[in-house]
UniProtKB/Swiss-Prot annotation:
It comes from Vibrio vulnificus (strain YJ016). It holds the Pfam family Methyltranf_PUA. It catalyses: cytidine(1407) in 16S rRNA + S-adenosyl-L-methionine = 5-methylcytidine(1407) in 16S rRNA + S-adenosyl-L-homocysteine + H(+). This is Ribosomal RNA small subunit methyltransferase F. GO terms for molecular function: RNA binding; rRNA (cytosine-C5-)-methyltransferase activity. The keyword rRNA processing applies. Its main location: cytoplasm. GO terms for biological process: rRNA base methylation. One of its GO terms (cellular component) is cytoplasm. Specifically methylates the cytosine at position 1407 (m5C1407) of 16S rRNA. Its EC number is 2.1.1.178.
Length: 472
């Protein structure tokens, strides 16, 4: 029990007025005081669900399916010695520790859809939904992952890197700019909006310490601006999902109704009744999901799916972009780089991407990103392949996480002790020596790229992925 969960009396009085008649306040308070069940999502960019279930069984983990996410599971695991986040499986990117209800917005976005060519995640950090979207896109097309807080972009990038995402472009803007800067550019938009966090008390007992009705209204005003901009950035015929981890109608239903009032018949609410068995328990008359903690034993949450039926006006903006620092590699340069990569690491580049150059750095951008390159300033795009030196190319870690399958000739298998050393950023000393750059593999998963130097493999793990204690 979270006996210290703070629930302001004015908040509880408000909940009484919006709680559906089938639910009661005693259950609401009781569930708010219970810790959340831990949940994870299998990262299918790295492993199939079936293969992961086999690993989980071997490790003695008990998994229960999350009904609204085919790759999501509640997990029971002994973390007394090693936290889940420090297991080899997590550090290899095989799964993401993600609250079950936060898997729902992405499932709602992809409901009945085959594939999206371009997706905007408007408020992306720390990356749980971004990596979920990338997996459903199967690394195809372009995924713009925006985060307003500069301090959180680094964490977002580290999670994208760990999970093997290669079709993302990261930006660092207020989400209100997208309607003007990239109007009608995306097939799908996720707006998981900043909110008052009324649904998060089960993981943070102090979440409501600064709650007030005034702050709810202030946040709702920002959310209305954000949803307008997100809708303007959506292509006609496209779909968006608006979600929050809060319960107040001012931040949920009323924000969606504001969008409908602003853009009229261009806005269509699409029912989420078929998202999963049992969805009707949280369904509103508009087809939204308004989820109280006791309904599915989860966080409080809200999800709405909205279709754009017609083009709408977008604000005029005066762009000052500056010179774009990358240039597309010539056919000759591309062929040289691709041959060198194939010769040294046995890697072929995907057909839907193009090599770009910046000084001596070699990058791989998704082709679907190109129309946006002159329209928005990105902080990071695609993956870094190499740094060019006098004697050739120094290949980069993201090749290992995003392009290597494990079937390459240049793979070295290591044991548990060596894997621990590797994740701590240290060089390793396999029994047999070799030469050149190699992929390092542990228990079937590629964990990095290193280079033989005498009898050791020099560690190429980026600093942001290094862990220094309490490993598997």
């Amino acid at each position: 029990m979270h006996s210290n969960v703070y629930l302001p009396e004015t908040f509880l009085e408000k909940i009484k007025t919006i709680l559906p008649s089938a639910l009661n306040m005693d259950d609401f308070i009781a569930y708010c005081q219970q810790p959340l069940r831990k949940s994870i999502r299998v990262n299918t960019l790295k492993i199939s669900v079936d293969a992961f279930l086999t690993i989980a069984q071997e490790k003695g983990w008990t998994l229960h399916p999350v009904p609204w996410c085919e790759t999501g599971f509640w997990i029971e695991a002994d973390e007394s010695k090693v936290p889940l986040g420090n297991t080899a499986e997590h550090m290899c990117g095989l799964f993401y520790i993600q609250e079950a209800s936060s898997m729902m917005p992405v499932s709602a976005l992809f409901l009945g859809e085959n594939q999206f060519e371009s997706v905007l995640d408007t408020a992306a950090a720390p990356g749980s939904k971004t990596t979920q979207i990338a997996a459903l896109m199967n690394n195809q097309g372009i995924l713009v992952a925006n985060e307003y807080a500069a301090s959180r972009v680094k964490v977002l990038h580290a999670n994208i890197e760990r999970c093997g995402v290669r079709n993302a472009a990261l930006s660092n803007f207020d989400g209100r700019v997208f309607g003007g800067w990239l109007p009608e550019s995306f097939d799908a938009v996720l707006l998981d909006a900043p909110c008052s966090g009324e649904g998060t008390v089960r993981k943070d007992e102090d979440a409501m310490k600064n709650w007030s009705q005034e702050s709810v209204l202030e946040i709702a005003a920002t959310q209305k601006d954000l949803i307008e901009s997100a809708f303007q950035a959506l292509k006609p015929g496209g779909v968006m999902v608006y979600s929050t981890c809060t319960l107040s109608e001012e931040e949920n239903q009323q924000v969606c109704h504001h969008l409908k009032h602003t853009f009229g018949d261009a806005v269509a609410f699409e029912s989420l009744s078929s998202l999963f068995d049992g969805a009707e328990k949280a369904l509103t008359e508009d087809g939204f999901l308004h989820i109280f903690p006791q309904v599915y034993d989860s966080e409080g949450f809200f999800v709405a799916r909205i279709r754009k039926l017609a083009s709408v006006n977008s604000p005029d903006v005066n762009k000052k972009m500056g010179k774009f620092p990358f240039q597309k590699a010539s056919k000759k340069e591309s062929a040289l780089i691709e041959k060198s990569l194939s010769d040294s690491l046995d890697i072929s580049l995907p057909a839907d991407s193009t090599i770009w150059l910046r000084d001596n750095d070699v990058w791989l951008f998704p082709n679907a990103l190109e129309p946006m390159l002159g329209e928005l300033r990105f902080s990071r795009m695609g993956i870094k392949l190499a740094e060019k030196h006098k004697n050739g190319y120094r290949w980069q870690h993201q090749i290992a996480t995003t392009l290597a399958s494990g079937d390459e000739k240049t793979v070295v298998d290591i044991d548990t002790d060596a894997a621990r050393e590797w994740f701590m950023g240290r060089d390793i000393y396999p029994e047999n020596s070799g030469k050149g750059e190699v992929f390092v593999r542990y228990q079937g998963a590629i964990i990095g790229l290193g280079k033989w130097v005498s009898n050791k493999i020099k560690n190429g793990l980026p600093r942001e992925l290094v862990r220094d204690k309490n490993l598997f």
